[in-house]
Amino acid sequence: MYQLKKLYNEELKAKLSEELGIKNPMLLPKLEKIVISVGAGDHAKDTKVMQNIADTISLIAGQKAVITIAKKSVAGFKMREGMPMGVKVTLRGNQMYNFLEKLISIALPRVKDFRGVPRNGFDGRGNYSFGLNEQLMFPEVVYDDIMVSHGMNITMVTTTNNDKEAFKMLELFGMPFAKGRVNG
């Protein structure tokens, strides 16, 4: 089931070592975790909608999502301390590779007019973030079960501090990047 993890351990480590010129296998870039988050925005006040968003993200990730809560009150955002603000889930290990495989091979190809994920999502420290406009591209999501169409932010945290190494690793995993060049 975890074909990407097997692929990384059996083939990609050797390719990365050769292409990046890293001889020590412990210094090779690895995927540490994937964080999926949703900002609820105007829907934060409705507990049923928040629970529906959490359930949807839990289905997509295969792991229970957590509703995030505001730590401070900010009048400009009409936000009070303790108010629900969004949903997040952190994936590690086999769940992480399972989600990445589903994202690359099933979800992203189902996006209409998809031209690749943007290359400018790297943060300068080897982590990659991008956003999706809706959740309907995932096979677990049933249209009739969702109350609100929402997007999500996906952040991939790697062990490297270099964007080019992280890009090379994600590219070898099969991440469909758009044409252009990488930051850094």
From Swiss-Prot:
Annotated GO biological process: translation
Record keywords, A-Z: Ribonucleoprotein, Ribosomal protein, RNA-binding, rRNA-binding, tRNA-binding
PROSITE patterns found in the cross-reference section: RIBOSOMAL_L5 (PS00358)
PANTHER family in UniProt: 60S RIBOSOMAL PROTEIN L11-RELATED
Keyword RNA-binding set for record: yes
SUPFAM superfamilies reported in the protein's UniProt record: RL5-like
Job of this protein: This is one of the proteins that bind and probably mediate the attachment of the 5S RNA into the large ribosomal subunit, where it forms part of the central protuberance. In the 70S ribosome it contacts protein S13 of the 30S subunit (bridge B1b), connecting the 2 subunits; this bridge is implicated in subunit movement. Contacts the P site tRNA; the 5S rRNA and some of its associated proteins might help stabilize positioning of ribosome-bound tRNAs.
Gene Ontology cellular component list: ribonucleoprotein complex; ribosome
Protein name: Large ribosomal subunit protein uL5
Gene label: rplE
Gene3D superfamilies per UniProt: 3.30.1440.10
Pfam families, alphabetized: Ribosomal_L5, Ribosomal_L5_C
Gene Ontology molecular function, alphabetical: rRNA binding; structural constituent of ribosome; tRNA binding
Lineage: Bacteria, Pseudomonadati, Campylobacterota, Epsilonproteobacteria, Campylobacterales
Subunit relationships: Part of the 50S ribosomal subunit; part of the 5S rRNA/L5/L18/L25 subcomplex. Contacts the 5S rRNA and the P site tRNA. Forms a bridge to the 30S subunit in the 70S ribosome.
InterPro entries xref list: Ribosomal_uL5, Ribosomal_uL5_bac-type, Ribosomal_uL5_C, Ribosomal_uL5_CS, Ribosomal_uL5_dom_sf, Ribosomal_uL5_N
Keyword Ribosomal protein attached: yes
Residue spans crossing the bilayer: none
Organism in which the protein naturally occurs: Wolinella succinogenes (strain ATCC 29543 / DSM 1740 / CCUG 13145 / JCM 31913 / LMG 7466 / NCTC 11488 / FDC 602W)
Family: Belongs to the universal ribosomal protein uL5 family.
